[in-house]
A protein has these predicted regions:
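ADP-ribose/NAD+-binding catalytic cleft of ART/PARP-like enzymes
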Residues: 1-60
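Short, glycine-/Ser/Thr-/acidic-enriched flexible segments
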Residues: 31, 69-70, 198-200
């Protein structure tokens, strides 16, 4: 078992999404002039098409999306989704066309998302994560988290801050996906995770959930 197993036994900081909270999601088109007419086309991907990603193993569907900041009035979850799913946006050498469909979802019940701590892995995280990090520091100062657990949390934060695209980062997705899987198994009250968007210079807020949301 990985060394992060014991951190799921400590006090978890959670962001709760109230009923009706907006979640933005995007899907890339696989062909020109493609239209999605059904909710299922924009929801969870088919199991057989799911590959290893930041919070899931091969064949393990998860609901990826972006949520609005509680602090920043100019927050744009659509931009977060775009950058998280299309690395070509930041590639000056890319020439071509890509079609996308955005969808707006509302959660049917309260959803509890485990907040990934930022530590020093994120130079400029969204204020939402800075606020939670202050709570993490209180836990550490009160000795409710020991040094070993702190080191594991820092390592977890570091892996979440990587895109997994560079050769030296290729194991990061396996690490974070394994953690997320273990978290859900040991804490059924946790519905997903929330983390800073790396490709938006940590300003966006990404969220992953395995619970069901619905189109408005």
């Amino acid at each position: 078992m990985n060394d992060y197993a014991n951190i799921t036994q400590i006090t978890l900081l959670v962001r709760r999404l109230d009923i009706g909270t907006k979640v933005i999601r995007v899907r890339q088109h696989s062909q020109e002039n493609q239209l999605f007419k059904y909710r299922k086309d924009l929801s969870y991907p088919p199991k057989e098409k799911v590959k290893l990603a930041r919070a899931n193993m091969d064949g393990q569907p998860m609901f990826y999306g972006a949520v609005f900041s509680n602090f920043c009035i100019n927050d744009n979850p659509r931009l977060t989704c775009l950058l998280e799913t299309n690395k070509e946006v930041l590639d000056d050498t890319f020439v071509g066309k890509k079609d996308l469909t955005y969808s707006l979802w509302l959660n049917k019940r309260e959803i509890n998302l485990f907040v990934i701590p930022v530590f020093d892995s994120y130079p400029h995280p969204a204020k939402d994560f800075e606020w939670y990090y202050e709570l993490w520091k209180e836990l550490m100062q009160d000795d409710r988290i020991n040094k070993e657990q702190i080191n594991v949390l820092k390592e977890l934060s570091r892996h979440f801050s990587l895109t997994g695209e560079k050769k030296e980062e290729e194991n990061s997705y396996a690490y974070t996906a394994d953690f997320t899987t273990h978290l859900f198994k040991t804490h059924p009250e946790i519905d997903g995770i929330i983390y800073p968007s790396v490709r938006l210079k940590e300003e966006g807020i990404g969220a992953v959930s395995y619970t069901h949301l619905t189109l408005p």
